[in-house]
Curated annotation (Swiss-Prot):
GO BP: isopentenyl diphosphate biosynthetic process, methylerythritol 4-phosphate pathway involved in terpenoid biosynthetic process
Cofactor(s) the protein requires to work: Mg(2+); Mn(2+)
Enzyme class: oxidoreductase
Name assigned to this protein: 1-deoxy-D-xylulose 5-phosphate reductoisomerase
């Protein structure tokens, strides 16, 4: 494989850091540049180690990041920044790169149809980085009856329902399987993250929401499954290690990453449970809003505001779904373009703060 150039949007985040480590292991990739938000010290350390001449802070907006992509036109762009802005950057990355690795869920949640329209006009491969979607990509086969996405259930999965309102950020951030950023770890506990992944799977593979089933799988070994028409079930198993899907996305369709160990099938029990929608009220909203990008954008924006306020201990954990539901209910209409989505995102954040003030 010839050396490929890459820009990492979100180089100081969990996915960004692990991507840098994977690239060090693989070789054959040259990091041209990256973005960071506020962690300048870590960004400078990465830049010095890898001799990056293009390092952009996004703390004041994303215009410079867009300019960097236009100037560098890397072979690969990794979009690994949280929030709605990932949609804007993903659209630009599709324009300028041959391959876009998408780790930011919000891009497809809020603007899936925009991403797919852009892909029609560009010779770009969009590759998922999420463990569930890269797993599904590897086992996908038609015709099928149903696909399965698994969920750990988050840090509070074994708490009594009547105690959930007492959960503090330190409790919620103790994820039982994965090591991730703060927002996504909270989203795992509410299963908002899994709702995002259902939307993503629908967009990536053009699957109706009704054919995507989520199961609680506490062991974190099975990442996805597919039920085929002849009663066969295919499952994808692997360690809870994001470096594996990152490496696969970088080298697809080849496997270049070496990790000579596998889950112990003899001494591991695999269990599956249906989702308790009483425990995860924000999750069940996905079925009501799946066809409405305005409400999906409101869902994302209100969640982001609610999670931040929970992490700052301004609201209770059980207030998060209440904020989301009220904002989504108050969001009406359809969207025509990116401008409409940006406006809804802005309005939804404002509404979320208003709801929080009234709790």
């Amino acid at each position: 494989m010839d050396n490929r150039t890459i820009v990492i949007l979100g180089i100081t985040g969990s996915i960004g850091i692990q991507t840098v480590e994977v690239i060090q292991s693989l070789g054959n990739f040259h990091i041209l540049g990256g973005t960071y938000h506020k962690n300048k010290d870590l960004a400078d350390a990465i830049s010095q180690k890898h001799n990056l001449s293009n390092l952009i802070s996004t703390s004041r907006g994303y215009d410079l990041a867009i300019e960097m992509l236009e100037k560098l036109r890397p072979d690969i762009t990794l979009v690994a920044i949280p929030g709605f802005s990932s949609l804007i950057l993903a659209l630009k990355a599709i324009e300028v790169s041959k391959r876009v690795l998408l780790a930011s869920k919000e891009a497809l949640v809020c603007g899936g149809w925009l991403i797919k329209e852009k892909l029609k006009n560009c010779e770009t491969n969009l590759i998922p980085v999420d463990s569930e979607h890269t797993a599904l990509m590897q086992i996908y086969e038609e015709p099928f009856e149903e696909v399965i996405i698994t969920s750990s259930g988050g840090a509070l999965r074994d708490w009594e329902l009547h105690n959930l309102h007492n959960a503090k950020p330190k409790d919620v951030l103790k994820h039982p399987v994965w090591k991730m950023g703060e927002r996504i770890t909270v989203d795992s506990a509410t299963m908002v993250n899994k709702a995002f992944e259902v939307f993503e799977a629908s967009e990536y593979f053009n699957i109706p929401i009704s054919k995507i089933r989520v199961l609680i799988h506490k062991e974190g070994i099975v990442h996805a499954g597919i039920l085929l028409c002849d009663s066969t079930i295919k499952l994808h198993l692997g360690f809870a290690d994001m470096k594996v899907p990152i490496a696969y996305a970088l080298t697809y369709p080849e496997r270049k990453y070496k990790k000579p160990s596998w889950p112990d099938l003899v001494n591991t029990n695999l269990s599956f449970e249906n989702v308790d929608e009483t425990r995860y009220p924000a999750f069940k909203l996905l079925y009501e809003i799946s066809e409405n990008y305005a409400k999906r954008t409101a869902y994302n924006a209100s969640d982001e505001i609610a999670v931040q306020n929970f992490l700052e201990e301004k609201i209770k954990f059980t207030d998060i779904p209440k904020v989301i539901e009220k904002v989504v209910e108050s969001t009406n209409g359809q969207v025509r373009d990116l401008k409409d989505l940006i406006q809804i995102d802005k309005e939804s954040r404002k509404k979320a703060l208003e709801v929080i003030r009234c709790l």
